[in-house]
């Protein structure tokens, strides 16, 4: 059974219930809804399909809302026709609302003329076209064409190493987040996060609406990397979004940055997702390239909690095959992980929760020494399972909770298999009911060794949530 989680992007393919069901049956842990495309009616239809399938299969697949985020794009062109930009010639970008031609084109971000200066690079269409700023005059940015090509309408624009003053959240993002709250999404992936302030702004919106959605920060540019530590602290997880990152910074630097982000998230006990073009060729072909297989495996070796499929499942020709291939790569790679090294590393886990950290570490070590079948972690919020997962035990972590939302959020944690369980009134009842549930599910059997770890409160405060993970017990299954 795979331990690294897989996120699949929804799209035209998943308008079909049979395909949605096949994705869930073949290992999709989280469904990603990309709000850069589609309207609310379309997104709601897919979400209802997901809810229907997860209820039928009794699998708590989570739903992630990926915001469009603040972005810069080119404008419309005369007659809708592409224009040819030739190397060495001049092209003008303007914030004035015009119909572009082969001499001048509109740019959607009104503040760009104030943010750039002579010598700055402007990249268009994933970096296929490169312009160098020569001078700025009012609303016009006069550029030299460094790399030419065909310029189409509404193409993405990146400005490497320039701190643009775009808002952290657009009005569309705020409306989409409100929609996500109403529809019961489990995660928000915030695009183009540059500072921790963006995360706090989203969390304020969630708190005002009584939502416990987890916020994932997408790191996509140099400013986000520069403020990485603060963003990790503010967020509930990180996505290494390598698409725009590979345009904003030199592509050859992305592998090191990926490893650095994953390592920092592991140390901070925050889940991390590796995304973009992982099995990209399977959009068109039934098998991946060797380089893509290696890319997925290396992300697992690096310590990622989850890997993500984008166009492969959203609109590719082989969505289920891509998912199955990713699952098989992950499972094979996990056979060769150095689990001993994970136990020896020091997780800086969550400051005030050092009691929890010590108990979880002891639970993982004990499970290893006794070759325990599973580590069982009853938890209201899922905190214990998140902490356990960072120690990467060989034993499967079973997360038990009465909270459906907590179970779905556990789907992002490495090595955690969530099951719904009732809240128990005492430790003995908790352990007994947990063993009975897992026997009925076929997870454990008679004479198996099980390590149970949980946060338990004193009888005086039995109606309050536990502050720490504070007990560990070894159980031989009757």
Regions found by a protein language model. Name each.
Residues 1-478:
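Non-catalytic helical/linker scaffolds that mediate oligomerization, partner binding
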């Amino acid at each position: 059974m795979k331990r690294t989680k897989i996120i699949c992007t929804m799209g035209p393919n998943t308008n079909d219930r049979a395909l949605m069901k096949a994705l869930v049956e073949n290992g999709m842990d989280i469904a990603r809804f990309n709000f850069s495309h589609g309207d609310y009616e379309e997104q709601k239809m897919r979400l209802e399909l997901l809810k229907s399938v997860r209820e039928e299969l009794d699998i708590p697949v989570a739903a992630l809302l990926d915001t469009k985020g603040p972005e810069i794009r080119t404008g419309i062109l005369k007659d809708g026709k592409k224009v040819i930009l030739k190397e060495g010639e001049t092209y003008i970008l303007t914030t004035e609302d015009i119909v572009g031609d082969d001499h001048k084109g509109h740019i959607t971000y009104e503040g760009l003329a104030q943010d750039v200066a002579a010598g700055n690079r402007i990249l268009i269409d994933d970096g296929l076209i490169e312009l160098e700023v020569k001078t700025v005059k009012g609303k016009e940015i006069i550029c030299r064409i460094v790399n030419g090509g065909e310029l189409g309408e509404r193409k993405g624009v990146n400005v490497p190493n320039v701190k643009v003053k775009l808002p952290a959240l657009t009005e569309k993002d705020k409306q989409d987040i409100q929609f996500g709250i109403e529809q019961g999404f489990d995660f928000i992936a915030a695009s183009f996060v540059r500072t921790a302030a963006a995360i706090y702004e989203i969390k304020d919106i969630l708190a005002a609406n009584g939502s416990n959605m987890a916020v994932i920060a997408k790191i996509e540019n140099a400013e986000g990397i520069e403020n990485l530590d603060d963003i990790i602290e503010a967020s509930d997880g990180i996505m290494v979004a390598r698409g725009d990152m590979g345009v904003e910074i030199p592509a050859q630097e992305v592998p090191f940055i990926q490893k650095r982000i994953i390592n920092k998230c592991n140390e901070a006990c925050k889940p991390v997702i590796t995304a973009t073009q992982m099995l990209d060729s399977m959009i068109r072909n039934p098998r991946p390239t060797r380089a893509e297989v290696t890319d997925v495996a290396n992300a697992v070796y690096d310590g990622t909690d989850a890997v993500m499929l984008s166009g492969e499942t959203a609109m590719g020709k082989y969505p289920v095959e891509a998912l199955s291939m990713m699952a098989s790569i992950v499972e094979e790679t996990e056979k060769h992980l150095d689990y001993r090294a994970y136990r020896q590393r020091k997780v800086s886990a969550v400051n005030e929760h050092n009691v929890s950290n010590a108990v979880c570490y002891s639970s993982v070590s004990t499970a290893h020494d006794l070759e325990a079948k599973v580590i069982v972690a009853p938890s209201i919020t899922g905190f214990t399972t998140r902490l356990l997962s960072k120690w990467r035990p060989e034993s499967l972590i079973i997360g038990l909770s009465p909270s459906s939302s907590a179970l779905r959020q556990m789907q992002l944690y490495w090595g955690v298999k969530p099951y719904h369980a009732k809240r128990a009134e005492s430790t003995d009842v908790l352990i007994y009911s947990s063993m009975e549930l897992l026997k009925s599910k076929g997870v454990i059997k008679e004479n198996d060794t099980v390590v149970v770890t949980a946060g338990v409160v004193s009888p005086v405060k039995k109606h309050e949530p536990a502050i720490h993970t504070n007990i560990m017990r070894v159980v031989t299954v009757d």
